[in-house]
Amino acid sequence: MKNCLNICLPVLFAVFAVALARGQNDQNEIQITRPVSSLGNTRPIPVSIEGFDSEVTAILKFDLYVQGFTFVSPETAQYQISGSSTGSVVGRVVDRFGKKTLFSRSYNGATLRRQAHALTDDIVFAITGKKGIAQTQIAFKVQASNGNGEIYIADFDGHNYQAVTHDGTIVSAPAWAPGRSALYYNSYKRGNPDIFYHNLTTGERDDIAHYTGSNISPAVSPDGSRVAMVMSESGSPNVWVANANGSHPRKLTSTSEDSSPCWSPDGQWICFATKIHERRVLAKVPAGGGEVQVIRTPGTPNPTEPDWSPDGKWIAFTMQAGEFDICVMPADGSAPPVILVRGEDPSWSPNSRTLIYARRTGGHYVLSLLDVYTKQVKDIHQILGSDSEPAWAR
Amino acid sequence: MKMMKLVYPMTLVLAVTLAATGCRNHKPVGVTPIPNGQGGQVGELPPGGTMGGNQPGGGQQANMQEFENMTEDRAALANYTIHFAFDSSAIRHSEDANLQSVASALSSDPSTKLLIEGNCDERGTEEYNRALGERRALAARQALAKLGVDPARIRTLSYGKDKPTDPGHDESAWSQNRRDDFVLLHPKTGA
């Protein structure tokens, strides 16, 4: 009760002060409104697409849909995209309202598919001023029904996939080394859950964590210099940080049920799932060591598998409450999380608005994309088996 | 009078604010420092955990080497698998008899070691389950230590939800899958 008064009085004063200030200026009563979602509800940008063959049209539509565009007739489009794809791709974008051509360009390159992706990146940049994601890559795991699997990489839309491992063992949690063509992942190849570093160019790999217990869930710092992981060598699974080659591992937490570390884009914090005071929560700890701080997720219990957007603004995570739902909240805690779509294990694209995640269907996983502002979702091109644990290269 | 018009809505706003935030949570949203009683400070690996981290294939902890060159005997302790409640790594009393049997097997042959494999049902996310399986294996190791087994003879690993014994999608299957399997390890004989 004493605590109540400690808040009530200052709040009352503050509210009263605001009321007085406002009362000076307008005659209206103060409205009580429900808090608006911090993500808002952005309407997709309407564009038209004409002149390309069906495969190129499909690629343009896929790329643009998951970045918040929708497709209408030329007469009602805000931007008109036209061109051709005989031989190579030629594309042109006209701003219908402004009555001007944003660009007109021809592309050459290995395949029509690559050219089409280059075109959509130019379209996104010309219209939004932001870099597009059509030429980015993902890593994920493909799992067979016996539990064994392999690590794969692919274009962000699931095409041009290739297996990175051929070990016929259990693998999980691929994570890109930023700025390098390399992956970290967990593999049971040596009879224990270990973390490997795998150079994709040379094919060489080292295990960088082979301690007793389970070495799982690698997450690489944004500058590529350090790797966070969950290790249980000390007797309970905790968050550890080591240099990129695995040297000098340091235990960062003593909380009891840690999993899924991820880094803030400034490299200062590691966010992870844990259990504090009997409640499952998200938390963050300074990457150099320090106090663990809870990140509250009001309205979304049992948060897990967080991922911090590259622009620093958002944390996406999985809520486990019977089903699994992808949620997004402001990283500064200034608004509660928003529940977006059924699914698990989100990973942010470099554009900080498209998420890739896994959703369960018929006993296996498929990978899907979500634009968090327009809420548009689309499955990517699926590979055989169960595809899950996606990681978007940044 | 402008002030009179405002008092009623202000009281309402105050009431709503209090109801929404509750009186207990008077810290700013998002930041609650946790006193890290066991030491939030950064800790190095304990002595004996030296690794050649800078060498290719480095990072092998001494303990792991002690478990190499052993053969796995899955049959010996197959009947003593212990099971867990949903989302829990707590050892239930119903499992005491099985743990005692495992402890007896280990004490009857001091040359043996033990591998505990922790598993989960499918109702968790993948990395959460991988950590939960590990906690289940560690809990059994702790329980065996209380029964007199030297924990240095035991290593743990987690399969998360990757190795269910029952592929079904109901509680009957799930309860079978939430388990620790015990694998007896014998030193390899011969030259």
Per-segment meaning from a language model:
Chain A
Residues 22-62:
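A structural "domain/chain start" motif
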Residues 76-122:
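Amphipathic beta-strand/beta-sheet edge segments enriched in Tyr/Trp
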Residues 131, 142-150, 168, 186-195, ...:
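A flexible loop/linker signature enriched in serine peptidases of the S9 family
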Residues 138, 183, 224-228, 267-271, ...:
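Hydrophobic beta-strand positions that form the internal "hydrophobic ladder"
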